[in-house]
Amino acid sequence: LTLSDGQYASCRKHGFEVRIRDCRTVTPEDYGTFDAIVSVGAFEHFCSLEEYKAGRQDEVYRNFFKTVSDLLPVGGRFYLQTMAFGPKMIGHEAMDIHADNNSDAYVMALAAKHLPGSWLPYGSEMITRNAEPYFKLINISNGRLDYIETIRRWRIMLRSFNVRKYTLY
């Protein structure tokens, strides 16, 4: 399942069965249950800044974990890969698109501008607390430094001149 037309086209091209659909609305009646479910990079888009401000972040995450749990048989596996704010992250009220480009205030404002409807969970504790009624945690790892390097390389490539890149837009 995906919400991305590009991911849909790529999956079809490679012979996968795929549907465009919000995974949070799927029930066992739709497709049955699955032996395993993988979620990569979607979780951080399930809760909006508005829902966070309204105090609904935990509810949004609990509902997601219940939906996934309902789609798995006993003994089924779930893999979640997501980003989360660290313990030193500034509050949403400190976001400032005019702040220094290397500041948390700027990065947060930039993310809110370019990823509307998305707000990260606050730490792995928030994730595990909401998953706990439905899942047993087997492993947790932090790829923060890997992601920082990924972002660094993206910035270099995005800022570099490339004729093909400009013809696409």
What are these regions (language model features)?
Residues 2-6:
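Conserved SAM/SAH-binding beta-strand->alpha-helix loop
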Residues 8-11:
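Short alpha-helix immediately C-terminal to the canonical SAM-binding loop
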Residues 14-27:
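Conserved SAM-binding strand-loop segment of SAM-dependent methyltransferases
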Residues 24-40, 44-46:
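A short acidic, Gly/Pro-enriched loop at the edge of an enzyme's catalytic core
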Residues 47, 72-73, 132:
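Short conserved AdoMet
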Residues 54-75:
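A short glycine-rich, Lys/Arg-flanked "PGG" loop and its adjoining helix->strand segment in the class I
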Residues 78-79:
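A short hydrophobic/small-residue beta-strand
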Residues 83-169:
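Substrate-binding/catalytic lobe of Class I Rossmann-like enzymes that use SAM or dcSAM, i.e.
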